[in-house]
Amino acid sequence: MWKNTLFTEDNLHVMQGLDDKIIDLIYLDPPFNSKRLYDAPVGSRAAGASFNDMWTWDDVDEAYLEDMISNYPSLVQFIQSVGDIYNQNMKAYITYMSQRIIQMKRILKDDGLIYLHCDSTASHYLKIIMDKIFGKSNFINEIYWKRVAVSGKGSQFKPKNLVQIQIVF
């Protein structure tokens, strides 16, 4: 097992290689489904890199759908409802997230904590997913904070969408 290692990018396959109940704390800051394309700034070390935060069914690892259907039928029903009510892109996003959160539950110790960082785009869906995977009784709290941005615009500055959410189980 890796010790004191930080993994970036898609974590699904890394988690599948880990034993059950070995992790004390998980903090995740996943994509928010913002429907935007993010490009690294020109001149930065990451110049030329980009991240597409728009989700389709191509982003879902279909090999793990059978496990979800067998072990989390109410979660699958919820995901289907979101697709019917909202749209197929949100359905793809929350399926993608559910597959990873299921693995996180498996590797998290019984007395471990998980902090999910998100914004209002899908926080309400992610909270229900966490309830269905971890159980409603394991919900601890939500933490909200408003980020403060410094601007030279003085009183003309109007912050937008700076509230961040942490869902804790």
Predicted features along the sequence, with ranges:
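Core catalytic lobe of class I
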Residues: 1-169
